[in-house]
Design a protein with these regions (language model features):
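Small-molecule kinase domains that catalyze NTP-dependent phosphoryl transfer to phosphate-bearing small molecules
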Residues: 74-81, 93, 152-197
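Short, Lys/Arg-enriched N-terminal segments with co-localized hydrophobic residues
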Residues: 1-15
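Conserved phosphate-donor/acceptor-positioning beta-strand/loop module used by diverse small-molecule
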Residues: 125-148, 153-163
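Pre-Walker A (Motif I) flank of P-loop NTPase domains
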Residues: 17-21, 25, 110
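ATP-dependent small-molecule kinase phosphotransfer cores
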Residues: 56-111
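RNA pseudouridine synthases
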Residues: 106, 122-126
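Short beta-strand-centered segment that lines the nucleotide-binding/catalytic pocket of NTP-utilizing
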Residues: 45-56
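Glycine-rich phosphate-binding P-loop
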Residues: 23-36
């Protein structure tokens, strides 16, 4: 891990009454929809867009910056993360620290579903947290992107390649773990094969 990456202080509490589910996902796998539907089914809060807003309020950074740079590397990958730190910590490093604080505070406050933003790593010391990774075959993710954004196939293909590369670089850098590695999560589900609703049902049974 880079010397400029802000370490997360993880303390395992003696008693934890809340139950947290973190949803990490490949772009185009439907992880955000799964998180939303799961929270509705369980009657708990899903932090996705609202999480971004809370980070905006606490950090003072613009919403677009928080949304894009809170889980994706700037530019093309790990090299940009390293180059940007020649003069010291970057705004992305500061954002990482604030983001970690907000996620930890939410987990302390209530049972909830948290989508993305390395929440699985940030909350890894908690015994009340179930970490999930949602994935799907590349062609099925392309189909979903085309349907969701109305993009031509070639553009959807490029979008996924770029998003995967930047998200992986960000996660690997700040957590010192490999994004998408099954060993980093309690549950990995293929939404392309199972479908959105089946993934929701499986996770609800594990809650």
């Amino acid at each position: 891990m880079s010397q400029w990456a802000v370490p997360v202080t993880l303390k395992k509490e003696e008693t934890m009454e809340n139950r947290i589910i973190t949803i990490s996902r490949e772009h185009g796998s439907g992880g955000r929809e799964i998180g939303r539907k799961l929270a509705e089914k369980l009657g708990i809060h899903c932090y996705d867009a609202e999480l971004i807003q809370r980070i905006v309020e606490k950090s003072g950074y613009p919403a677009d910056f928080v949304k894009e740079k809170g889980e994706d590397a700037v530019g093309g990958g790990i090299s940009m993360l390293l180059v940007d730190r020649r003069l010291g910590p970057t705004h992305q490093d500061t954002l990482w620290k604030v983001q970690s604080q907000v996620i930890s505070e939410l987990a302390d406050k209530e049972s909830c579903v948290i989508v993305g933003r390395c929440a699985d790593y940030i909350l890894q010391a908690r015994s009340d947290c179930l970490t999930v990774f949602i994935h799907a075959a590349f062609d099925k993710r392309v189909e979903r992107i085309i349907k969701e954004y109305g993009e031509p196939e070639e553009k959807a293909y490029r979008r996924l390649k770029d998003k995967d590369k930047r998200r992986m670089a960000y996660y690997n850098y700040y957590t010192d773990k490999k994004w998408g590695n099954a060993l980093n999560y309690h549950v990995c589900l293929d939404s392309g094969e199972l479908g959105i609703d089946k993934c929701v049902d499986v996770l609800a049974q594990l809650y």
